[in-house]
């Protein structure tokens, strides 16, 4: 099976891009970030390229490259463009594909469209990345509830951070969702340490079945 997987998070800056890089390398998949907001200092696609070890042709070009590091709806407004759903159809490519969203599920793309609306349209399995720090239970369960209300399939939750197994277990029990594993904070962080962590912490079959 050649999976197409959406990676989203309970919040911004939780390690979603690092996870996406690790997953793309783990599955030898292509990577696509539909909307990049903020171009100074490098993009998420360039970071994934460095951390995944994938060849350049596996890093698909963004549909929207916006200059301002802000919510996509605002970054697009500043650039004088509007993000439309029809422009965000999933690329038809051979092989597996990892798609990374921006921020969380309720991030607006324009005045009447949220990222979760796009995910519902795609109807692809979602990996929800959640931090392990204090507050994650509420954020994770709200995100699971939002996905379920839209009928979006959930592949499972990938936790990122230090080991807080009680929080992870209660989220998965109450949310009735699969625990995919936990990606620890890595120092140093490079493609070798990231792939080693994925091989230790995750099972490939959980993403392909």
From Swiss-Prot:
Positions with a binding annotation for ATP: 13-18, 100-103, 184-186
Annotated catalysed reactions: (7R,8S)-7,8-diammoniononanoate + CO2 + ATP = (4R,5S)-dethiobiotin + ADP + phosphate + 3 H(+)
Active-site positions on this chain: 33
Principal cellular location given in the protein's record: cytoplasm
Binding site for Mg(2+): 17, 47, 100
Keywords associated with the record: ATP-binding, Biotin biosynthesis, Cytoplasm, Ligase, Magnesium, Metal-binding, Nucleotide-binding
Protein location: Cytoplasm
InterPro entries in the record: DTB_synth_BioD, P-loop_NTPase
GO biological process entries: biotin biosynthetic process
Enzymatic class: ligase
Gene Ontology MF, one: ATP binding
Entry annotated with the keyword Ligase: yes
UniProt record similarity statement: Belongs to the dethiobiotin synthetase family.
Name under which the protein is recorded: ATP-dependent dethiobiotin synthetase BioD
Organism of origin: Rhodopseudomonas palustris (strain BisB18)
Gene: bioD
């Amino acid at each position: 099976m050649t999976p197409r997987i959406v990676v989203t998070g309970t919040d911004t800056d939780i390690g979603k891009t690092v996870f996406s890089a690790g997953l793309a390398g783990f599955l030898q998949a292509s990577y696509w970030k539909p909307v990049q907001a903020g171009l100074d200092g490098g993009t998420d696609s360039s970071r994934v390229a460095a951390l995944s070890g994938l060849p350049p042709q596996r890093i698909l070009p963004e549909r929207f490259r916006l200059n301002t590091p802000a919510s996509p709806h605002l970054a697009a407004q500043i650039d004088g463009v509007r993000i439309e759903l029809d422009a965000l159809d999933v690329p038809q490519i051979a092989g597996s594909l990892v798609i990374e969203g921006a921020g969380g599920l309720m991030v607006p793309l324009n005045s009447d469209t949220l990222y979760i609306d796009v995910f519902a349209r795609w109807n692809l399995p979602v990996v929800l990345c959640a931090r392990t720090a204090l507050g994650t239970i509420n954020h994770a369960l709200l995100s699971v509830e939002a996905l379920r209300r839209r009928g979006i399939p959930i592949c499972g939750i990938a936790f990122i951070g230090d080991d807080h197994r009680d929080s992870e277990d209660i989220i998965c029990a109450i949310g009735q969702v699969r625990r995919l594993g936990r990606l620890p904070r890595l120092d140093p962080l490079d493609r070798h340490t990231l792939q080693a962590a994925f091989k230790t912490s995750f099972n490939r079959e959980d993403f392909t079945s």
